Design a protein with these regions (language model features):
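Outer-membrane beta-barrel "beta-signal"
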Residues: 287-294, 313-327
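C-terminal outer-membrane beta-barrel translocator/porin domains of Gram-negative envelope proteins
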Residues: 116-254, 263, 267-269, 309-311, ...
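Transmembrane beta-barrel architecture of outer-membrane proteins
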Residues: 41-43, 83-87, 127-131, 175-179, ...
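Transmembrane beta-barrel strands of outer-membrane/channel proteins
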Residues: 1-5, 9, 30-33, 59-63, ...
Length: 327
């Protein structure tokens, strides 16, 4: 059920001398009344891939709409962030044999981010980011080991923001960032599978929130989606997962319950506040159902450990559905 915001009035709709309402009719914060929190996350993605010889060209477009609330003494305000990203990538296979594969990639993406409080715009910026990466996979102790080393640089192109006259504590558009991702997949039995993923991010610049490494919630450390996440210019995130395939049918699909534990830690540059650093850990108990054109994922999330300034709920439920098309 979505929180009721029908009582809110835009400034231009108020009569001369009229005060904007702080809540619905009958709302009294002095009696302990609390207005509902609003949290919405909508993701839209499109990706097209074209392969020719040892090259792969990928075009991508995505849109993220994230709404959350924050409280003042007697009312609640809603904040919305909208991000539109267009990307192009070209990958070249350098080495491929029966056991290993090595790929070099270059890419360019343009990000347009806008933030609002109610209907008032807070920020409107464009970042253009170039990146290069080296990606490899190989067999290792009966499993498959993968690693990716990447470098990103903010560029003065396509209408991007520039850093001229910015202070040392101001977020940088012309930043440098390094990333390292590793993953390991190993079947322990015919049905039992172990997965391990780790991500490291390092930058000496103060990054915008869209470029910081974010940890917590869906697709990350479980149990922290509704209470915000932690972000950092430097970060490490680790995930361990065990899954058991109870159904493996070409006709009916694949069904796998799973259990995972994740940990994340961040640090921010030029920041002396309580949010300078943070950590969290959480567990997921879930069920995946994969078919030819549809993937479903339902999970129970439980926060375990955290920094003191984080106030997670006791539990959360996640659900996702993905439609797949090939043409």
């Amino acid at each position: 059920k979505k929180p009721d915001r029908s009582w809110k009035r835009a400034t231009e709709n108020l009569k001369p001398g009229e005060i904007a309402p702080i809540g619905p009719k009958g709302y009294d914060p002095k009696k302990g009344d609390v207005l509902p929190y609003k949290r919405d996350l909508d993701l839209y993605n499109f990706r097209y891939t074209l392969k020719f010889n040892t090259y792969t060209l990928s075009l991508g477009s995505s849109r993220t709409e994230n709404t959350s609330s924050f409280y003042t003494t007697n009312t609640v305000y809603d904040m919305e962030t909208v991000s539109n990203t267009f990307s192009v990538n070209l990958d070249k296979i350098l080495l491929r044999n029966q056991k290993s594969k090595l790929t070099f990639g270059i890419g360019l993406k343009r990000k347009h981010n806008q933030s609002y409080i109610e209907e008032a715009i807070l920020s409107d910026r464009v970042l253009t980011i170039g990146d290069i990466s080296l990606n490899g996979t190989t067999t290792f102790y009966g499993g498959l080991l993968g690693a990716s080393l990447g470098y990103e640089r903010g560029m003065r192109a396509l209408g991007a923001e520039r850093d001229k006259n910015k202070g040392v504590r101001s977020p940088k558009a012309e930043f440098m960032k390094y990333t390292l991702n590793t993953n390991y997949y190993k079947p322990l039995t015919q049905k039992l599978v172990y997965r391990f993923n780790t991500t490291l991010t390092h930058s000496n610049d103060v990054l915008y929130g869209s470029e910081k490494h974010s940890i917590g919630g869906v697709g990350s450390v479980g149990g922290f989606h509704r209470t915000g996440n932690i972000q950092g210019d430097k970060a490490i995130e680790i995930e361990n997962e065990l899954s058991y395939r109870v159904l493996d049918s070409e006709k009916f699909g694949k069904l796998s319950p799973y259990l995972s534990y994740s940990y994340g830690k961040v640090r921010n540059n030029k920041n002396s506040s309580v949010h300078r650093k943070g950590y969290m850990s959480g567990a997921l108990l879930g069920l995946r159902y994969n078919m030819k054109y549809l993937d479903l994922d339902l999970a129970y999330a439980k926060p375990l450990a955290r920094s003191n300034y984080l106030k997670p709920k006791n539990r959360e439920i996640y659900f996702s559905a993905t439609l797949k098309f090939k043409f």
